[in-house]
């Protein structure tokens, strides 16, 4: 049995993967933005071990979520899946922390959780998108930007930064799940949830070829792909980590 924590698992790909994993007998901890969504997530995945609640647009709630996650037994796999800012979830909101909600949820929250949660035993994934190819690696004004593509590039950069820091200790990767029919993808999306959910579930338990992906790999449902070249820029990776630390007050463990 593998223990897995999936953010943004009250609907969409996160919930679909959680269902697959739970039905296979694995221990899955879900995450929802509020109590109402948590209740419906638990109903949708009745075999889930628990549902943790936290609004990832809030720095304080994200820190509290990390604390709650650390009270549970260690996870083998953590999936940073939560995201907003595309299609039906497009947002121009500035949060109470005076930053873009898109940046807060898509970039800052996975950074905070990675830094504050106990390191997973085996695998860590940042959910990206092919929209990251249009992202700007300059990192100009990123805390106020509402660009979805920029934040999805940040997710690949975060994966690469932590992969570089942690070496071969665990597998750290990023993924484009495809344009699928979810609340974010919209009803016009050509793909169904089944394939990305199963690929994500297979990766989460270290099944098949995905278990052998090199840490720092960006992959899709078809296998490894080349990411935006800016994602490999170590100087920019470190700059992104510095910005996230300055905004959140949370530093990377050990430096």
From Swiss-Prot:
GO MF, any single term: oxidoreductase activity
InterPro entries referenced in this protein's UniProt entry, alphabetically: NAD(P)-bd_dom_sf, SDR_fam
EC number: 1.-.-.-
UniProt keyword Oxidoreductase present: yes
Enzyme superclass (EC): oxidoreductase
Keywords attached to this entry: NADP, Oxidoreductase, Stress response
Record's note on what induces expression: Up-regulated when grown with elevated levels of potassium chloride.
A biological-process GO annotation: cellular response to osmotic stress
Residue positions of the active site: 148 (proton donor), 152 (lowers pka of active site tyr)
List of residues binding NADP(+): 13, 37, 55, 81, 148, 152, 180, 182
Name of one Pfam family that matches: adh_short
PANTHER family, A to Z: CHAIN DEHYDROGENASE, PUTATIVE (AFU_ORTHOLOGUE AFUA_4G00440)-RELATED, RETINOL DEHYDROGENASE
Function: Involved in osmoadaptation.
Family per similarity comment: Belongs to the short-chain dehydrogenases/reductases (SDR) family.
Protein name per Swiss-Prot or TrEMBL: Uncharacterized oxidoreductase AN7799
